[in-house]
UniProtKB/Swiss-Prot annotation:
Descriptive protein name: Large ribosomal subunit protein uL29m
Organism of origin: Ajellomyces capsulatus (strain NAm1 / WU24)
Subunit structure: Component of the mitochondrial large ribosomal subunit. Mature mitochondrial ribosomes consist of a small (37S) and a large (54S) subunit. The 37S subunit contains at least 33 different proteins and 1 molecule of RNA (15S). The 54S subunit contains at least 45 different proteins and 1 molecule of RNA (21S).
Gene Ontology annotations for the cellular component aspect, listed alphabetically: mitochondrial large ribosomal subunit
Region (Disordered): 77-107, 223-248
Name of the gene encoding the protein in the UniProt record: MRPL4
Domain of life of the native organism: Eukaryota
Subcellular location: Mitochondrion
Biological process annotations from GO: mitochondrial translation
Record key words, sorted: Mitochondrion, Ribonucleoprotein, Ribosomal protein, Transit peptide
PANTHER family assigned to the protein according to its UniProt record, in alphabetical order: LARGE RIBOSOMAL SUBUNIT PROTEIN UL29M, RIBOSOMAL PROTEIN L47, MITOCHONDRIAL-RELATED
Record-stated family: Belongs to the universal ribosomal protein uL29 family.
Predominant place of localization: mitochondrion
Length: 248
């Protein structure tokens, strides 16, 4: 290897005399760096992480139902014996709770599918004028009664589709439409009350309304008395359905 390196240098420099050549013991230092590659890391400190063991991301690796191979790692269930199934005849019958909450998904008679006559026997939806007279608690209770009724209607519809009964869909949809109308009316009344409260809050913050004005208006409301109604009864006939209120 040193003789080949010196010969290459002689060819490159065009026949240089042997006197100008370096000593023979310096020949390894004259080798080209491109001919040799470092097989070890030169720096003592490096940010490159050391190659570690690769984790298997598949938890079911090697598990096969065809070849009946179980998991590679022992599980905690294998330490305890599995319970044996009990025959249906030997099972103890659990008493049913008549006040269970899931009975709310069925009617009072607890039938899975009511008849079309029972589905059609319902009244009209509540109007907005009627709901404006109700309190907050009454509106809350009425809304959740509508939710409970819609759950019962959906349960009966699912049972009809499962059993392919072929009847009761029209009556059920009509009943559900009526209940949804009541819910929409309740939302409209609550929306009106929210807008009224928002307007009152803005008036109070702007200074256009004060509690003193409310006391004056309240005093005037108590002082006001509506006039008595004058109803003329026909001569010779006394009407019992219309009565004249006593004069104050």
């Amino acid at each position: 290897m040193p003789s080949r390196t010196i010969t290459r240098l002689v060819r490159l420099y065009g026949g240089t005399p042997l006197v100008e050549l370096p000593p023979i013991f310096l020949a390894p230092a004259l080798q080209f760096p491109s001919l040799h590659f470092a097989s070890f890391q030169c720096l003592k400190f490096s940010t490159t992480p050391a190659p570690g063991l690769k984790l298997d991301l598949s938890k079911h690796r090697g598990v096969s139902a065809i070849h009946r191979t179980g998991p590679r790692y022992p599980l905690s269930v294998s330490k305890y014996p599995l319970p044996r199934p009990v025959k249906p005849k030997e099972q103890e019958k659990r008493p049913s709770n008549p006040k269970h909450g899931l009975w709310g998904f069925f009617g009072p008679d607890r039938k899975p599918i009511p008849t079309p006559e029972e589905e059609y026997a319902h009244g009209r939806a509540w109007s907005i004028q009627e709901l404006r007279q109700k309190s907050w608690d009454d509106l809350h209770k009425l809304y959740w009664l509508c939710v409970k009724e819609r759950n019962r209607i959906a349960t009966a519809r699912y049972e009809r589709q499962r059993l392919q009964a072929g009847y009761g869909d029209y009556e059920s949809n009509n009943r559900d439409k009526t209940v949804r109308g009541t819910q929409q009316s309740i939302k409209q009344v609550l929306r009106e009350r929210w807008y009224a409260w928002e307007d009152a809050r803005q008036l109070y913050e702007s200074g256009e309304y004060s509690p003193a004005d409310a006391q004056v208006m309240e005093a005037e409301a108590y002082a006001y008395e509506p006039p008595a109604l004058d109803v003329e009864e026909p001569k010779g006939e006394a009407s019992d359905s219309v009565k004249t209120p006593p004069s104050s």
